Amino acid sequence: INPQGSIGWHGAGMQPVFFKNLVSKLGLEIQVFRVGTYKSAVEPFIATEMSPANREQMTECLESVWNRIQADVSDSRHIPTDTLNAYADRYMDFCQAEEYVQCGLADTLMYKDEVISYLKQLSGRDEDDKLNSLFIEDMINVKKNVPKDKSGNVIAVYYAYGEILDAPGSSTEDCIDVQKMCKGLRKLRDNDDVKAVVLRVNSPGGSAYGSDQIWREVVRLKEKKPVIVSMGDYAASGGYYISCAADRIFADPTTLILSAYSA
């Protein structure tokens, strides 16, 4: 850790924002057709606080994520989970850097130039040698330089990231264009060189109609070749809908798999 750095070890939490009073002051009325006790996405517009059902599910979600984080850190840093909880209760976010080392959350204090020197030692390089390195964003361009596979045995990876939209318009945020994705899945279905497809899903859901159209294309794709879903941070609502037609689904222990939306 940098001598002037910090580690935000203070547990997990969330703070929802509610707009009901604002909506009332503006003279607006929100009309909601809601199905299911735990369908909570519209609560910010119709309530001033969390419903018991939503608080229950959000608490369970946070506890699951926090327990997983604790378990992983405990295994890697060899610190008991009770001790990690005690550190979090102290809100270890504004401590002196030395304290993180004393607590076992960091090994030592180093500035960036010292880290580079340390890496050179680990790799057997001289101090004057250049250390070749890549930032994560540099990896984006790697696939552009990979020769096209001509073996006729390709495993395709299709990324389904963002909200599912029937008509994305001019949105600059990551989104799943329903028509574009359906067309892409059809191309993979008809490509004889593609022997299997990995569908990487990281989506909060979106259009129910659009999700159903994508689901249909996944079903048709699976008729000709295996389809495996790999879930990212979340696969909620329509995100899970488009995933459930796959042959196999793999998710991280902290992946949010839920349905939170109302019609």
Q: What kind of region is each of these model predictions?
A:
Residues 2-89, 94, 106, 120-229, ...:
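Small-residue-centered hinge/linker elements
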Residues 100:
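Short, contiguous alpha-helical
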Residues 110-114, 119:
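A non-catalytic alpha/beta surface segment that caps or lines the substrate-entry region
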